[in-house]
A protein has these predicted regions:
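Short capping segments at the starts of secondary-structure elements
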Residues: 50-54
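N-terminal leader segment of winged-helix/HTH proteins
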Residues: 1-32
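Short amphipathic alpha-helical boundary/capping segments
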Residues: 24-36, 118-124
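Residues within helix-turn-helix
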Residues: 55-56, 67, 74, 94
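Short alpha-helical "packing" element that flanks the helix-turn-helix/winged-helix DNA-binding module
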Residues: 43-44
């Protein structure tokens, strides 16, 4: 196997692992009746760690483009999990905050995700 083939195989295996993890998370969320996509979870997880951040910052943290993130935030707002507020220094800069329902959701979802990480670590 050449060096180029090894690098390609490593990238493919990394992608397969990521896809398997993503599917495992989605199965667990569905099993526990949490109506949330993996992409929504990425955004919510960022906000559970620090809310009141800009869409630009969320885009960087989640590796999502602006259009995709806008759509995700719109959907999260429809579920009443997040709210956009004007930034204090620039009214055009919208900051994203959790609603009380979004904060409460963490009590259900975070333990599920922690269990997935624990199980994954135990299997390695």
């Amino acid at each position: 196997m050449t060096n180029n083939e090894s690098e390609r195989e490593l990238v493919l295996q990394t992608l397969r692992t990521w896809m398997a993890f993503r599917q495992a998370v989605q199965r667990v969320l569905k099993r526990h009746n949490v109506d949330m996509t993996f992409e929504m979870l990425q955004v919510m997880n960022c906000l559970w760690n620090k809310q009141g951040i800009s869409q630009q910052s969320l885009a960087e943290k989640t590796a999502k483009d602006k259009a995709c993130l806008t759509n995700l935030i719109n959907n999260l707002e429809k579920k009443n999990w997040v709210i956009r507020k004007e930034g204090p220094s620039d009214r055009r800069n919208r900051l994203i905050f959790l609603t009380p329902q979004g904060e409460e959701l963490a009590l259900t979802v975070k333990p599920l995700i922690n269990d997935i990480y624990a199980q994954t670590g135990a299997e390695m």
